[in-house]
Amino acid sequence: MTDSKIIEQIRQLLRIASDRGASINERELAQRRAERLMVRYRIESLPEGDARARDEDMTSIQVEITGSSSSMARAVVDGLATLARALSCFCSWRTYRRHIVATIVGTRSDLAYVTEFYNSAVVSYPSMLKDRLRTADFYSQSERRRFRRSYVMGFFQGIADRIEIATREETTSTGQDLVLASRYQRAEAKACEGHNIRYARDLMIDRDGEASGERDGYASGIGWMGERLDGPRVGIAAS
């Protein structure tokens, strides 16, 4: 099967997984098949040669997230970093007054997956978060905000968990897990070249919110929302 056919099959499965008209079983089956096919494609497409040859394929993209560090934007970019790491990419970010700019380094194929799964996540989580908020009680607005942030971070963690489980199952006894680990390390080294990257402080976590988000993220039918893998990135509001 050619690369283009594999990618189209992955996209078709992910469209089914995100189709609200499909049954839960159909969406879950499509999602699992898409994840396994994606992981297998990533493994089989690993380039040959030494590390320096593979470094040539390293590149970067930027994602702008609207909102200050005190808004939901900080939780979204934290989730993006979690998702990027699960796909062997390294994410750092710079905070501005009204937005955050994340820079993600990795191979072109891995960055394409990060982009599409990220786009799917930011479309999917708001309605699920709204459902959770309807049944939750809070003593203060700050507690409510902490729950919302924690939920978003947990949602991305749930998606990353599924990717990592599928990757482990596919790379068992093949040695390719070491190659993927090396790919992340090279992405991190590439990001740090000539830059003094300061790691952000952890946000205060609401454990119930994080656990709820992680369950929903793991169980979500994340679809392939975007067909365009190149070109400028569109700022995504984080309210």
Predicted segments, located by residue:
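Long alpha-helical, hydrophobic tracts
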Residues: M1-I61
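Long, charge-patterned amphipathic interaction tracts in eukaryotic proteins
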Residues: K5, V39-S239
